Amino acid sequence: MTHHPDELEIWFLTGSQHLYGPEVIDQVAEHAARIVAALDASPHLPVRVVSKPVLTETDSIRRALLDATATDSCVGVIAWMHTFSPAKMWITGLDALRKPLLHLHTQANQALPWAEIDMDFMNLNQAAHGDREFASVQTRMGVARKTVTGHVEDPEVARRIGLWARAALGRHALAGMRLARFGDNMRNVAVTEGDKVEAERRFGVSVNTWGVNDLVAVVDEVADADVDKLCEEYADSYDVAAELLPSGERHESLRYGARIELGLRSFLTEGGFTAFTSNFEDLGGLRQLPGLAVQRLMADGYGFGGEGDWKTSVLLRTLKVVADGLPGGTSFMEDYTYHLVPGEERILGAHMLEVCPSIAEGRPSLEIHPLSIGGREDPVRLVFDAAPGPAVLLGLADLGERFRFVGNEVEVVAPTEPLPNLPVARAVWRPAPDLRTSTEAWLMAGGPHHTVLSTALGAEHLDDLAEMTGTELVLVDADTTIRGLAKELRWSAAYHRLAQGL
């Protein structure tokens, strides 16, 4: 499934004014084009950057930002004040902007030509205070934005702009997302519930429910020839258990798993859905709880949440888009159990079946095992250990009055010992700053037990996404203390309640 359509772009807006004359404006445009070309050539940018005409007056600024807001292909705006652009000209435009904004504080030249500097040079290259003017009005208006300082030849500048651009792509995907719930939430579970109307108002995602037997009807219509072809793909991609091979006694179970995948994929494609949920308590006429099918759809970029958890499904799809093209993987995850030996503390995460193979180390095995819940036939699933490396965990909580992201920086590690009797995919990680602080902080913040684990993303991606969506982010990292977090949560609650009342 395509994550970053070719037509998507970021608009680069350069501010100036008519005071300096047309020759200076032409130079400003030339310098802006060079900066855009450098950004466009950077491997850090996942989407093209498009230079727009230099903006010099209130009406053209307002029109440019209205156009950015109304243009579906524009996922965000980068703004730079090359010369001095009086910021009162930007007020109505900034007030109309509804796309993510990055304020690039840069200049055309990296080194000053000391012996050649005259007042013409000073008038042209005055972003040092032109951007301060621009930032002051943004702060007064409460404009959400990211600020990046430095010359575009500095790889760190392009890297940080690239992080923001990825978050903007995620926000764009979120704003147009359609999610299909097959059945309802797991009975009596609190954390998988949430306000779907507020989610659509806040994020733009449309969450609706279909009967499981609507899916079953599509599954039952899948052609045998298509099942044959998909089973061949399984054999090429995974280490298939002997009993599931064509000569094995349980090959029919694999064929039914393939039938579920083909039917589910068809249903989602036809409906324009990029995320979905299932619930083992509501399987209708399905003979298996979807396992392999869900894992492979996640690997292709779909969002998923178990037990009807649409919030985590939304989050997974969003972060899949943010991470597209980066090394590592991104998966649905659940904290399951702890290793509490002093000095060796770590968390074992898994789920009944549905962990994405994008985080796998090596070639997954395709197996069949009993499942004690759901009351259906034994489901097929991929089994693997997650690849070691730095990662982030992120959950989305509905606090009633607002949504909150809760995140944790972690280190995925190899299992301390082999897990020969655990018939599901799994990940083991050490949370920052330590298990005790991490878990106490997570519980204090009301973080959910379903999360997204990503070895492709870092904390700055999460910061940028939270800023763009106007969502609180509680991030547990190496610097977190329980005392400090308790204060942060109190201050944050006061801030958000006050902000909603204004």
From Swiss-Prot:
UniProt-listed Enzyme Commission number(s): 5.3.1.4
Swiss-Prot/TrEMBL cofactor(s): Mn(2+)
Catalytic activity: beta-L-arabinopyranose = L-ribulose
GO molecular function: L-arabinose isomerase activity; manganese ion binding
Keyword annotations: Arabinose catabolism, Carbohydrate metabolism, Isomerase, Manganese, Metal-binding
Cofactor binding note: Binds 1 Mn(2+) ion per subunit.
Pathway assignment: Carbohydrate degradation; L-arabinose degradation via L-ribulose; D-xylulose 5-phosphate from L-arabinose (bacterial route): step 1/3
SUPFAM superfamilies tied to this protein: FucI/AraA C-terminal domain-like, FucI/AraA N-terminal and middle domains
Binding site residues for Mn(2+): E307, E334, H351, H450
GO CC list: cytosol
Keyword Transport attributed: no
InterPro entries associated with the record: Ara_Isoase_C (IPR024664), AraA_central (IPR055390), AraA_N (IPR055389), AraA_N_sf (IPR038583), Fuc/Ara_isomerase_C (IPR004216), Fucose_isomerase_N/cen_sf (IPR009015), Lara_isomerase (IPR003762)
Gene Ontology terms describing biological process: L-arabinose catabolic process to xylulose 5-phosphate
Similarity annotation: Belongs to the arabinose isomerase family.
HAMAP family linked: Arabinose_Isome
Function: Catalyzes the conversion of L-arabinose to L-ribulose.
This protein's name: L-arabinose isomerase
Originating species: Nocardioides sp. (strain ATCC BAA-499 / JS614)
Name of the gene: araA
